[in-house]
Regions:
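An N-terminal, well-structured beta->alpha segment
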Residues: 1-68, 72-73, 152-185
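N-terminal small/polar loop signature for handling phosphorylated ligands or for N-terminal nucleophile
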Residues: 36, 48-112, 200-259
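Phosphate-binding and adjacent anionic-ligand microenvironments
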Residues: 245, 283-460
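Gly/Ser/Thr-enriched, mixed-charge loops and adjacent short helices
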Residues: 13, 113-239
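Proline/glycine-rich low-complexity loops and linkers
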Residues: 71, 131-165, 169, 260-333, ...
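Short beta-strand-to-turn element immediately C-terminal to the catalytic PLP-Schiff-base lysine
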Residues: 117-120, 257-261, 338-340
């Protein structure tokens, strides 16, 4: 049983003892802390907070507690029900709310849930703001509303359609070209909110579709993380040759993976690369992704005359850096597309619409499009440590050892070699160092990772 507290909110498994899991008492405590934070930092606000949730089995229970607590704190709750993470983010700005709470554990298994906290811009809290919420929760410095100041719950199911409309109105989403292409797609929406909103998006785009795991029951048919090892069902379906494209989302629809017409993975790292290539071909500019993302985005950005910048891992770090450098597109290599023309948040609907627009313009197969991008492979490893290990000291030694290479230490240590890179990050929740490495072949990437791992082992 697990309860993890971080600057972006809290997540944990359902059931168990207070303080050990995500249970009703802790949900009340952290919702109250967030509401206290919003109250302290909002003047002349709407007094309204948006609440949306994915379809996981505990969602309705958590939603009831969150909404009731916010009402008890004197806030009106704009409850949008079953909704994607990007839909909830957009609902905050569309309704001019003071903030929002997304009830989702993203790609985690069904026994998990979480509260993800948004500011009035519909973006995740900064590190400082998140730490303030955690501090308020720790001190339990709460004051609830008197009976005459209690809030109310307003149910509003209009935001799916408003989200879709905003996507269709993006300048680079070519609805006519997509309709003329008469695409046929297969979609795995993993028994969550993708099965609610994506059919409506595809209908508006004139795309013929078949859905797998469409029922939003929250009883996930397979591990919900959109990785190749979890996607045998849709990959086998694609091998029938009946579809132009396979589309996979995670339970809250902020991550997006594609499958080629022949059943091969397009590659989660290449979701952002392909969409960025299309965007940059029409609106040249800068890009941002996190340090653990593929070098292919840098190559594509350079091809279009822009500058690529790496950010620390985490959506809020990526969006902050995007604003600093004026990036026209960015995201994370796990299939997260952030397109500021829409909003500063990962959005699979935006990614789907832009990818289909690109495919329609190029008039090629998905596998042919994939072949136009630089070929890189990422290996992922981990170094298990003892709880007493000084991880920061180890990372500092690694940095010193490779001082003659290009080193970035904004988030762990990343070493850039001319034709490959390796990134070491310490986990916030386990005594481990995560090791990501990339090269032109999987063998070379794995060998680089193992080489650095041996360097670390020799230091202990």
């Amino acid at each position: 049983m697990t309860l993890i507290k971080s600057i972006s909110g809290i997540r944990g498994t359902i059931g168990g003892r207070t303080g050990d899991t995500l249970n009703p008492l802790d949900i009340v405590k952290f919702t109250t802390a967030y509401a206290t934070f919003i109250r302290r930092h909002t003047t002349n606000g709407s007094g309204k907070i948006v609440v949306g949730r994915d379809a996981r089995m505990s969602g309705q229970m958590v939603d009831s507690i969150v909404s009731g607590t916010l009402v008890g704190m004197g806030f009106d709750v704009l409850n949008i029900g079953l909704a994607t993470t990007p839909t909830t983010e957009l609902a905050v700005t569309m309704s001019q709310a003071d903030g929002g709470i997304i009830i989702t554990a993203s790609h985690n298994p069904r026994q998990w849930n979480a509260l993800k906290l948004l500011n009035s811009r519909g973006e995740f809290l900064t590190k400082d703001d998140g730490n303030e919420v955690l501090d308020i929760a720790e001190r339990e410095d709460f004051e609830y509303a008197e009976v005459d100041q209690l809030g109310r719950i307003i149910n509003d199911s209009s935001f799916d359609d408003r989200h879709i409309e905003s996507v269709l109105n993006l300048n680079l989403v070519d609805v006519e070209a997509i309709r003329k292409s008469k695409f046929k797609v297969c979609v795995d929406s993993i028994n969550s909110v993708g099965g609610v909103i994506l059919p409506r998006l595809l209908d508006r785009l004139g795309v013929e579709y078949k859905f797998l795991n469409a029922d939003p029951s929250g009883d996930f048919a397979h591990n919900p993380e959109p990785l190749e090892k979890n996607l045998s069902g849709i990959m086998d379906e694609m091998k029938s040759g009946a579809y132009d494209l396979g589309i996979v989302v995670d339970p809250d629809v902020d991550r997006l993976a594609f499958i080629c017409e022949d059943g091969r993975m397009f590659g989660e790292e290449y979701t952002l690369v392909s969409v960025a290539d299309y965007v940059l071909s029409h609106t040249p500019g800068n890009t941002v992704s996190n340090l653990s993302s593929t070098r292919a985005l840098r190559d594509v950005t350079s091809k279009h005359g822009g500058t690529y910048t790496a950010a620390a891992v985490g959506e809020v770090n990526v969006t902050t850096k995007m604003k600093e450098v004026g990036a026209v597109i960015g995201g994370e290599g796990n299939g997260g597309v952030i397109y500021p023309e829409s909003h500063y948040g990962r959005d699979a609907l935006v990614g789907i619409a832009l990818f289909l627009s690109s495919l329609a313009h190029k008039g090629c197969k998905v596998s042919e499009l994939r072949a136009t991008f630089p070929e890189y492979f990422i290996a992922k490893n981990r170094i298990d440590l003892t709880p007493s290990t000084d991880v920061d000291a180890i990372l500092e030694k690694v940095k010193e050892l490779y001082a003659n290479e290009q080193v970035n230490d904004i988030d762990g240590v990343k070493i850039d070699f001319p034709d490959k890179w390796v990134h070491l990050r310490k986990s916030n929740t386990e005594p481990i160092i995560r090791v990501y490495s990339e090269a032109s072949t999987m063998e070379a990437a794995d060998a680089l990772g193992k080489q650095i791992m041996q360097v670390v082992y020799d230091m202990q």
